[in-house]
Regions:
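Surface-exposed, secretory/extracytoplasmic low-complexity segments enriched in Ser/Thr/Asn/Gly/Pro
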Residues: 1-134, 139, 186-188, 193-196
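Exported/periplasmic cell-wall-interacting domains
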Residues: 111-114, 126, 130-196
Length: 196
């Protein structure tokens, strides 16, 4: 099963991704993708051999993506372009959101992590807490530990170079109306693709 895992696992792998504007990006890391549960599969195989049975079946997965297409991302995902401070959200191949954002503050060492992540949870409302702050938000969608997408009522501008000196603690600050559209159309497990 290790050999199968090497062949079929995509969890945290390096993948090629076509961006909203047609560029090819190499996406490394994150926690999205498929990974065969080697312990469960080894146990199943051992028991099948002892019992003398054969079966065509899907393997047990420790982690699973939403799609088994070529890139396993499919056509429902959030894409965050850190360099251009732009976020897009596609659902079933239809563009629902295209918005400027403010990501992690580069100068303070709070850059938003890059990679392909699975949306971990959804909360509305929520209070985001860290050293020296407690920020109430209406829409909270974490994808990498304490980093996530959320509305930011304290901001009046998004996009441009704001993130370099006045960015977030790593989160993706989003206009409230756009965060609402994403929140109301996304589900846990959807891929979040973040790149520079």
């Amino acid at each position: 099963y290790k050999r199968q895992g090497y062949k079929y696992d995509t969890f945290g792998c390096t993948r090629t991704f076509t961006t909203y504007d047609g560029r090819q990006k190499t996406i490394k890391g994150g926690d999205y993708g498929w990974a065969i549960d080697q312990t469960a599969e080894t146990e199943w195989l051992y028991n099948a051999i002892l019992a003398g049975t054969t079966e065509v079946r899907q393997p047990a997965y420790a982690y699973s993506g939403l799609c088994r297409d070529t890139n396993d991302i499919g056509n429902t995902y959030v894409e965050i372009d850190l360099t251009n401070q732009r976020m897009v959200f596609y659902k079933d191949g239809q563009l629902l959101v295209d918005t400027p954002v403010v990501t992690g503050c580069v100068r303070k060492g709070h850059s938003t992590p890059t990679g392909c992540f699975a949306l971990d949870a959804m909360r509305s409302p929520a209070v985001l807490k860290g050293p020296g702050y407690a920020s109430p938000v209406t829409y909270w969608m974490p994808f990498s530990g304490g980093v996530g997408i959320h509305d930011a009522s304290w901001r009046s501008q998004y996009g441009g170079q704001i993130y370099i000196t006045n960015g977030s603690h790593g989160c993706v600050n989003t206009p409230k109306d756009k965060a609402a559209i994403i929140y109301n159309n996304i589900s846990v497990g959807v891929p979040i693709v973040v790149y520079e």
